[in-house]
Amino acid sequence: MSGDENKLKKYRFPETLTNQSRWFGLPLDELIPAAICIGWGITTSKYLFGIGAAVLVYFGIKKLKKGRGSSWLRDLIYWYMPTALLRGIFS
């Protein structure tokens, strides 16, 4: 059995197959729009409005996803956004 165990040790299995990268505890599809709102609030000196918009955008994306993965949100954008806007992103 030790020979089989040594063969299995060279493979690394993730905890889940859909384990996505997170920054500051948030997946990128939720972090980027919120960071854009906060950045806009900082550049226009409307700090509270930027933070409030970021919170609303964050919860809006969470409600839209409803426990589904980031790929579902990407596919939704692919099917419902105009082709001219997404030509360079989805090729």
UniProtKB/Swiss-Prot annotation:
Subcellular localization(s) per the UniProt record: Cell outer membrane
Keywords, ordered alphabetically: Cell outer membrane, Conjugation, Membrane, Plasmid
GO annotation, cellular component aspect: cell outer membrane
Chief place of localization: membrane
Membrane found in the keyword field: yes
Claim: Flavoprotein is one of the keywords in the record: no
GO biological process per UniProt: pilus assembly
Function of the protein: Membrane protein involved in F pilin formation.
Name recorded for this polypeptide: Protein TraL
